[in-house]
Amino acid sequence: MNDLKVLNCAYSFMDNYAQHAGLSILSLFDNNIEADEINVYILDNNICEDNKTRLNSIAKQYNRNIIFIDLAQLTSKMNVETHFCRSTYGKLFLAQIKEVDLMLTFDCDTIVTGSLLELLNIDMQDALVAGVQDTVNPYFVYKIGLSNDDRYINCGGVILLNLKLWRELDIENKCIDYVISYRGNPPFVDQGTVNHVCRDRKKILPPEYNLINPMFMFPVEKIKRLFRMKTYYSQNEIENAKKKPKVIHFTGELFNRPWFLNCSHPMKQIY
């Protein structure tokens, strides 16, 4: 029986995000020392050799692995023009990495502040994706085919993908078809795509795995009222997440990101 604690993780970014991705990856390594193995798959959208060397140097310090995968080749089946950077869609194609059945994906604007090993014990059953519930304009929830009863997950900060099931159910091609149906520009881009295609097979993670800005800005009852949500976390769950976050997601709304001057994010000092 194999009891090794192995984290398989993915990032997708262009060269100008390499600095932020590097800091996120460093925080991942630093807060998961107890993992037996960490493999980081980087979907490479023209990252320069100097930045690849820097990223490999971070991995070497922690005795971890970085694997670069050419994004253009990985996404070649999505033969449609889009207004958005192709890196944004990278997570839709991770099932092509056949040696991985369970993958954590991160955006570059995340900082890992705790162990993620408990995620390895989650029973995904028939769930295609697990993530933290997000706050979204009800109009866009309707646009992607969901109702107020559905819990929309944030696919930007951190999600857990059941790639074994993605391959079995051909989810990659279903995502491509959805993107093409909107001529390359579906509502909420990759997030809208994942929430639509996986709408009946999502698992909700505790909020500490993707602490997002609205959780700091509004009390729970106001969030439910503003976004017409029937189900959300309790105020106690949010407060506990703020005290002991596992991942902080520095999104651009409500607060400036911490690499900008005059950032007002309440956890900017962690960055």
Regions found by a protein language model. Give the residues of each.
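A glycosyltransferase accessory/donor-loop signature
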Residues: 1-13, 20-23, 161-163, 168-271
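Hydrophobic targeting segments
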Residues: 6-11, 28, 39-42
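Histidine-anchored nucleotide/phosphate-binding helix
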Residues: 18-33
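Short internal beta-strands
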Residues: 38-46, 131
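Active-site-proximal specificity loops/subdomain of glycosyltransferases
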Residues: 51-97
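GT-A fold catalytic core of metal-dependent nucleotide-sugar glycosyltransferases
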Residues: 68, 72, 87-138, 151-154, ...
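Short, charged, surface-exposed secondary-structure boundary motifs
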Residues: 77-79, 138-143, 214-216, 259
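Short, surface-exposed amphipathic charged segments that create phosphate/polyanion-binding patches used
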Residues: 79-88, 144-148, 219-225
